[in-house]
């Protein structure tokens, strides 16, 4: 009798991919088998893919190249035979973001051992803003601004002419619809709130800049606007 395990696991949360994660995964693979053969395949925004045999080679390449990483596949074979135990871990920050773990094993106990180790490792690299990565953040921001305008005008007893009211409502509806439909807005959102954050080579510098923009949007625009209205509302009772 021969046991065969074919399993695919998909994860909805976002992850940070950096050298520490890749070295941790490599260590897990080598602990299981010294015969492990690693391959890292990276897809970039120049429509090209690059294949590396080790972690250091991958980082050295992207230290010199400005290509934006879109997806990465980490494959490992535990042997040289075609039917050797295999694992493929995929991270995709494209139009259809994905984190996927595939197993082909001939032993159920070994499969569960590796699966648990990899998942424990990934848990340490979850993105702090991963919920925002999945939410339609741009329409939500427009909605928050729209609600803030409504609340503020109500507090101050400001009555806009009918034309202005229709214009504000129209901007909100058209803006929310456009952001959802047009790909350019999806790409902007995917850059500011990525489901997968690749901190590899020059991509780490890009992620640092995006983090500053993300903090400005969440901290200054949203929280600042809400706090401003709350403070204004409270001041009406005090003064």
Where do the protein language model's features map onto the residues?
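Short Lys/Arg-enriched alpha/beta "domain-start" segment
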Residues: 1-72
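Intrinsic-disorder-associated interaction segments
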Residues: 14-18, 22, 48, 107, ...
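Hydrophobic beta-strand residues in large extracellular and virion-surface proteins
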Residues: 40, 72-74, 89, 101, ...
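Residues that cap or initiate secondary-structure elements
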Residues: 46-48, 56, 80-82, 107-109
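Short, hydrophobic/proline-enriched secondary-structure or compact coil segments at domain edges
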Residues: 67-80, 97-105
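Broad, structure-driven detector of short, well-ordered beta-strand segments within folded domains
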Residues: 80-94
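Membrane-proximal, non-transmembrane alpha-helical segments
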Residues: 91-139, 153-167, 182-202
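Hydrophobic, helix-forming membrane-interacting segments
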Residues: 140-150, 169-187, 206-239
């Amino acid at each position: 009798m021969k046991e065969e395990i074919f399993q695919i696991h998909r994860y909805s949360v976002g992850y940070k991919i950096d050298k520490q994660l890749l070295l941790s995964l490599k260590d897990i693979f080598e602990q299981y088998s010294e015969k492990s053969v690693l391959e890292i395949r990276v897809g970039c925004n120049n429509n090209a893919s690059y294949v590396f045999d080790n972690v250091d080679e991958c980082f050295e390449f992207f230290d010199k190249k400005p290509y934006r990483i879109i997806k990465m596949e980490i494959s490992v074979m535990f042997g040289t035979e075609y039917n050797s135990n295999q694992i493929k871990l995929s991270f995709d920050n494209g139009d259809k973001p994905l984190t996927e773990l595939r197993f082909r094993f001939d032993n159920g106990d070994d499969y569960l051992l590796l699966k648990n180790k990899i998942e424990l490792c990934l848990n340490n690299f979850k993105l702090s803003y991963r919920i925002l990565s999945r939410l339609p953040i741009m329409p939500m921001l427009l909605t928050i601004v729209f609600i803030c305008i409504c609340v503020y005008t109500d507090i101050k007893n400001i009555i806009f002419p009918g034309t202005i009211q229709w214009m504000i409502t129209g901007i909100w509806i058209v803006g929310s619809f456009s952001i959802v439909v047009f790909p350019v807005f999806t790409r902007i959102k995917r850059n500011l709130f990525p489901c997968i954050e690749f901190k590899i080579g020059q991509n780490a510098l890009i992620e640092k800049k995006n983090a500053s923009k993300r903090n400005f949007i969440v901290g200054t625009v949203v929280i600042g606007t809400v706090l401003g209205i709350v403070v204004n509302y409270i001041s009406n009772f005090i003064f």
